[in-house]
Amino acid sequence: MLNNILKIATRQSPLAIWQANYVRNQLLSFYPTLLIELVPIVTSGDLILDKPLMKAGGKRLFIKELEQAMLERRADIAVHSMKDITISFPEGIGLAVLCAREDPRDAFISTHYASIDLLPTGAVVGTSSMRRQCQLRERRPDLVMRDLRGNIGTRLEKLDKGEYDALILAAAGLKRLDLAHRIRMIIDPTELLPAVGQGVIGIEYRLEDTHILSILAPLHHSATALRVSAERAMNAKLAGGCQVPIGSYAEIEGDQIWLRALVGSPDGSLIIRSEGRAPLSQAEILGQSIANDLLYRGAESILCRAFQVDS
């Protein structure tokens, strides 16, 4: 830390700033005299809004500039939505802390309709997530899926202007920005499986800065980390990114961890699902096992087609 000031790299969107301030306030509750400064950064993902995320370069577009700021020592840590953090890290960067998970589910937002089932044929649903599009197309093939980029406020404005009949957004982001009143329906994971790490704030740090890791330690939530480790182990085995719809959600039940996962074709015509339970100590092994089962059931062909198109 330069001049004993902890510098937090963050994107400039309202949700990202909220998350960075959340981390700041949590740290101050443990260390009232700690000096903390936010370092807002515009990322490539914030600038490229005219094409789907998978065609623009994937989720690294939202984090690479923040990681670069850390490597250049313009920032000490970086705060992200965990679902945006890729499986691999640049040399010298690692994952320090996972904060307690907010609501991991997706939310249905509409000005005229109370639920997905009440949308009329041909209704336009806004979401850029292939995972959401795939599962919605399986459930309602008569709906029109349209990409939607930008921060939460921009997306809601487009809905209010009538450009979309409904939106699907992460419930956690809406709740954090005091926009829960816009939610018409929370979608159960049995109907729409969340993304890996959804609802979790993750903090990256420089591996050499062990003193910063110790400062961050009180923010770490072990149960959340266990759940996300299973989800990310599954994703890593599948080499999942933005090229193919992948959903994964882990829950703790007593001394067991329960993991559900899916891989789907973008058009929703084929979705491969798997689930399983294991002792808490085998969370990552469970994730790998579920990935292998998905591959055995036919996910490999979906992944191969996606990567061929992407290349």
UniProtKB/Swiss-Prot annotation:
Q: What EC number(s) is this enzyme filed under?
A: 2.5.1.61
Cross-referenced CDD domains, in alphabetical order?
PBP2_EcHMBS_like (cd13646)
Give the SUPFAM superfamilies listed for this entry: Periplasmic binding protein-like II, Porphobilinogen deaminase (hydroxymethylbilane synthase), C-terminal domain
Q: Which InterPro entries match?
A: HemC, Porphobilin_deaminase_cofac_BS, Porphobilin_deaminase_N, Porphobilinogen_deaminase_C, Porphobilinogen_deaminase_C_sf
Tell me the cofactors it needs.
dipyrromethane
Q: Which residues carry this modification: S-(dipyrrolylmethanemethyl)cysteine?
A: 242
What molecular functions are annotated in GO for this chain?
hydroxymethylbilane synthase activity
How is this protein organized at the quaternary level? Answer: Monomer.
**Name of the gene this protein is made from:** hemC
Name the reaction it catalyses. Answer: 4 porphobilinogen + H2O = hydroxymethylbilane + 4 NH4(+)
User: Note on file?
Assistant: The porphobilinogen subunits are added to the dipyrromethane group.
Protein's pathway? Porphyrin-containing compound metabolism; protoporphyrin-IX biosynthesis; coproporphyrinogen-III from 5-aminolevulinate: step 2/4
* Purpose: Tetrapolymerization of the monopyrrole PBG into the hydroxymethylbilane pre-uroporphyrinogen in several discrete steps.
Q: Which domain of life is it from?
A: Bacteria
Q: What is this protein called?
A: Porphobilinogen deaminase
Q: Name one GO biological process term.
A: protoporphyrinogen IX biosynthetic process
- Spell out the GO cellular component terms annotated for this protein, sorted alphabetically and separated by semicolons: cytoplasm
What is the similarity comment for this entry? Belongs to the HMBS family.
NCBIfam families on file: hemC
Keywords of this protein's UniProt record, alphabetized?
Porphyrin biosynthesis, Transferase
Cofactor details (free text): Binds 1 dipyrromethane group covalently.
